[in-house]
UniProtKB/Swiss-Prot annotation:
Highly expressed in tubers and roots. Detected in flower buds and leaves. GO terms for biological process: fatty acid biosynthetic process; lipid oxidation; oxylipin biosynthetic process. Binds 1 Fe cation per subunit. Iron is tightly bound. Pathway: Lipid metabolism; oxylipin biosynthesis. The keyword Repressor does not apply. Residues 212-246 are annotated as: Disordered. Its cofactor is Fe cation. It is found in: Cytoplasm. One of its GO terms (molecular function) is linoleate 13S-lipoxygenase activity. This is Linoleate 9S-lipoxygenase 2.
Length: 861
């Protein structure tokens, strides 16, 4: 469309010395929450005249005065706007004409320099030259903020959408390519400013605030053998006054301003949606708290009906002058979200999927077990390969930590099999949180948390569902760690007080699983481990590099969401510490778990085999055979994994035909070296790192990176509200131990088991805070880009990769159809379970909002 309009306006037979182009951009005001009325169409003309200049750089004609780099064209300036491309309230994009002087010797442009002498920054989306003689259309994908030139130490340069390996870069563009990478790396000094584009590394030394007292001191994560950690983005903030090794923090009110490279910040719609969801959750959070002030038992839910009131009914939106004044003060995008017509009133929480169909089915043993395969944390369960289960903790430090579960506890529930027979038939499985928690449990229980380390044994029934057999709850020995643990084993019951005790035992398991999920499965294994890949890719791979083009969409918004997490979620006293049972030990515990992180094991087939829930099988479609056939996460995940791998293989094979091409790619080798030695530097000496010497190693590594950033994150994130939005199903904290006979708590359990249950799990205030958080995290923003989609259809000029990407998209569409078909198959009982919640977390696409489906390209929330 742009081409037709520009040809009509500017083309003609007499323009042989002129080259016509179209610039698409947005100005700052279009993205300003407080001044949406100042739309681009009103402000566009600020950039006309000579405030913004463009100079093309030839890829074929050198400049003898400039070290034989590509020759620059004369400056060209924006002409009158041609048209507005998008609605005003969406952050308007406007197209401008631009005319360059051109001659035959100049040839094909390979890059351009832009200079902004205006006082404001603007967002440059693209430049398109519609008809370069003897070449046709030349397109530059920009998608970058351009600040006034005095903010930069070097020229802003953008390259054509033609990928080049370093050795195949046109000679006249080579120096520009190298210099741009130097600019993005910076020199490792100084405090970063809002306009900076520098990517650099740092350790997690900014979670605590020692200037505010000892209670706000937190362990530095990364840079030590004791607490290794992936690196984060460097901000360069000064150290704290009391500890020169800790980085100072910015005030909470300025949280949105925490530094990330400018183009890593949330876009207009993403920020608007994010703030809207936060506003809704705050309102929903405050109102029940106000109501609780007039309650006889503040900070306690008195019954399950009390809990359900969070979701049912609620306070309807008021009408009248006050409401009109409120809506007048909120930006238009926020008003649209706040006044949604999908049944989500502003003053109540949406009903979580787990209680939509039935208010009680979540309490069944079948649903408890099913969520280990199809819930929000389906990545922990493993096959039991020795009985009783043995601990891997050092016995010199922790004594005997082996399980006390015996055959007598479980053999009456094995359908006539012995334990050995059940194990040999791959019928026994375990959800094991024991070894992860025991080293910290004594300290955790000095806080308001009172909990156990759990092991749960399960039996695979003939209908494909899992049946809980026994739950072991353990505490550190009261005489010291070296004496091991004290443990008690609980078995299923549906009669009297024993039934209530069994429900509590499952709740303690859910508390364990919730904390491990949030800290390990979610934060550590997706958010934290992917950030070094974001940084290294921008520092070492030019935007011209084909692997940069492959991976870049899978890093969108990750640095920004992680930076905000450090500021308000995972920091000392932050929301995470306030809502998970690990409390102030949470992040330190995740560093200890990172010691066991192995990059190749993050590949889905490798993970399934390592957990024993699959075996290698070359005759199976994905190279592995599942031992639990109806394992929704694994079944859907393997199809997504294979689609990603096929796409990555097609793409990489187009650029690399031999080992030699991998080895001589200096950018690729520098990228991989920096990832190992700096980004994940605490693991630089691990023998499992791929050597990056063969195309297959590149394909496998990129597939794993994309899997982590897209499907793995989707599987462990977007089910949070559907399953944990109803806190009794997945409590995050337990506040007292299992009641013992002869105590008042035990008598209460007999007389009012529901109240005893609610007094044991997460308190009302923590529940509201936690539910508010996961509602935000479980939503898709309206500008989300999903797996198989790209921001620009012209992201590359190479036709074969474009065709391969189209094939990838069609494969994902086929997978969607297969997921729908499987969810409709009544034989597959684990797909929906007793709560009738079809498994859609790995359904590739979604609309915006709280949908429980959709795989965004990146860790973006």
């Amino acid at each position: 469309m742009i081409g037709q309009i520009t040809s009509g306006l500017f083309g003609g037979p007499d323009d042989s010395k002129k080259l016509k182009g179209t610039v698409v951009m947005m100005n700052k005001n279009a993205l300003d929450f407080t001044d949406l009325a100042g739309s681009l169409t009103d402000k566009a003309f600020e950039f006309l005249g000579q405030t913004v200049s463009f100079q093309l750089i030839s890829s074929v004609q050198g400049d003898p005065t400039n070290g034989l780099q590509g020759k620059h064209s004369n400056p060209a300036y924006l002409e009158n706007s041609l048209f507005t491309l998008t609605p005003l309230t969406a952050g308007s994009e406007t197209a401008f004409g631009v005319t360059f002087d051109w001659n035959e010797e100049f040839g094909v442009p390979g890059a351009f320099i832009i200079k902004n002498t205006h006082i404001n920054e603007f967002f440059l989306k693209s430049l398109t030259l519609e008809d370069v003689p003897n070449h046709g259309k030349v397109h530059f994908v920009c998608n970058s903020w351009v600040y006034p030139s005095f903010r930069y130490k070097s020229d802003r340069i953008f390259f054509v959408n033609q990928p080049y390996l370093p050795s195949k870069t046109p000679e006249l563009l080579r120096k520009y390519r190298e210099n741009e990478l130097l600019t993005l790396r910076g020199d490792g000094t100084g405090k970063r400013e809002a306009w900076d584009r520098i990517y650099d590394y740092d350790i997690y030394n900014d979670l605590g605030n020692p200037d505010e007292g000892k209670e706000n001191v937190r362990t530095t994560l990364g840079g030590s053998a004791e607490y290794p950690y992936p690196r984060r983005g460097r901000t360069g903030r000064p150290p704290t006054r009391t500890d020169p090794k800790s980085e100072s923090r910015i005030p909470l009110i300025l949280s949105l301003d925490i530094y990330v490279p400018r183009d890593e910040r949330f876009g207009h719609l993403k920020m608007s949606d994010f703030l809207t969801y936060a506003l809704k959750s705050i309102v929903q959070f405050i109102l029940p708290e106000l109501h609780a002030l007039f309650d006889g038992t503040p900070n306690e839910f008195d019954s399950f009906e009390d809990v359900l009131r969070l979701y049912e009914g609620g306070i309807k939106l008021p009408q009248g002058p006050l409401f009109k004044a409120l809506t007048a003060a909120i930006p238009l995008e926020m008003i649209r979200e706040l006044l949604r017509t999908d049944g989500e009133g502003i003053l109540r929480f949406p009903t979580p999927l787990v209680i939509k169909d039935s208010k009680t089915a979540w309490r069944t043993d079948e649903e408890f077990a099913r969520e280990m395969l199809a819930g929000v944390n389906p990545v922990i369960i493993s096959r039991l390969q020795e009985f009783p289960p043995k601990s891997k903790l050092d016995p010199e430090a922790y004594g005997n930590q082996n399980s006390t579960i015996t055959a007598e506890h479980i053999e009456d529930k094995l359908d006539g099999l012995t334990v050995d027979e059940a194990m040999n038939n791959n019928k026994l499985f375990i959800l094991n949180h024991h070894d992860v928690l025991i080293p910290y449990l004594r300290r955790i229980n000095t806080t308001t948390t009172k909990t156990y380390a759990s092991r749960t044994l399960l039996f695979l029934q003939d209908n494909g569902s899992l049946k809980p057999l026994a739950i072991e709850l353990s505490l550190p020995h009261p005489d010291g760690d070296q004496f091991g643990v004290t443990s008690k084993v609980y078995t299923p019951s549906d009669q009297g007080v024993e039934s209530s005790i069994w429900q509590l035992a499952k709740a303690y398991v859910a508390v364990n699983d919730s904390g491990v999920h949030q800290l390990i499965s979610h934060w550590l294994n997706t958010h934290a481990v992917i950030e070094p890949f974001v940084i290294a890719t921008n520092r070492q791979l030019s935007v011209l590099h084909p692997i940069h083009k492959l991976l870049y969409p899978h890093f969108r918004d990750t640095m920004n969401i992680n930076a905000m997490a450090r500021q308000i979620l995972i920091n000392a006293g932050g929301v995470l510490e306030s809502t998970v049972f690990q409390s102030k030990f949470a992040m330190e515990m995740s560093a200890v778990v990172y010691k066991d992180w192995v990059f190749p094991d993050q590949a889905l087939p490798a993970d399934l085999v390592k957990r024993g829930v699959a075996v290698e099988d070359s005759s199976s479609p994905h190279g592995v055979r599942l031992l639990i056939e109806d394992y929704p996460y694994a079944v859907d995940g393997l199809e997504i994994w294979s689609a990603i791998k096929s796409w990555v293989s097609d793409y990489c094979s187009f650029y690399y035909g031999s080992d030699e091409e991998i080895l001589k790619d200096n950018e690729l080798q520098a990228w991989w070296k920096e990832l190992r030695e700096v980004g994940h530097g605490d693991k630089k000496n691990e023998p499992w790192w791929p050597e990056m010497e063969r195309p297959q190693e590149l394909i496998d590594s990129c597939t794993t990176i994309i899997w982590i950033a897209s499907a793995l994150h989707a599987a462990v994130n977007f089910g949070q509200y559907p399953y944990a939005g109803y806190l009794p199903n997945r409590p995050t904290v337990s506040r007292r131990f299992m009641p013992e006979p002869g105590t008042p708590e035990y008598e209460e359990l007999k007389k009012n088991p529901d109240k005893a249950f609610l007094k044991t799990i997460t308190a009302q205030l923590q529940t509201l805070l936690g539910v508010s958080l996961i509602e935000i995290l479980s939503r898709h923003t309206t500008d989300e880009i999903y797996l198989g989609q790209r921001e620009s259809p012209e992201w590359t000029k190479d036709k074969e990769p474009l065709a391969a990407f189209d094939k990838f998209g069609k494969k994902l569409t086929d997978i969607e159809k297969q997921i729908i078909q499987r969810n409709g198959d009544n034989i597959l009982t684990n797909r929906s379970g007793p709560v009738n919640a079809p498994y859609t977390l790995l359904f590739p696409t979604s609309e915006g909002g709280l949908t429980g489906k959709g795989i965004p390209n990146s860790v973006s929330i």
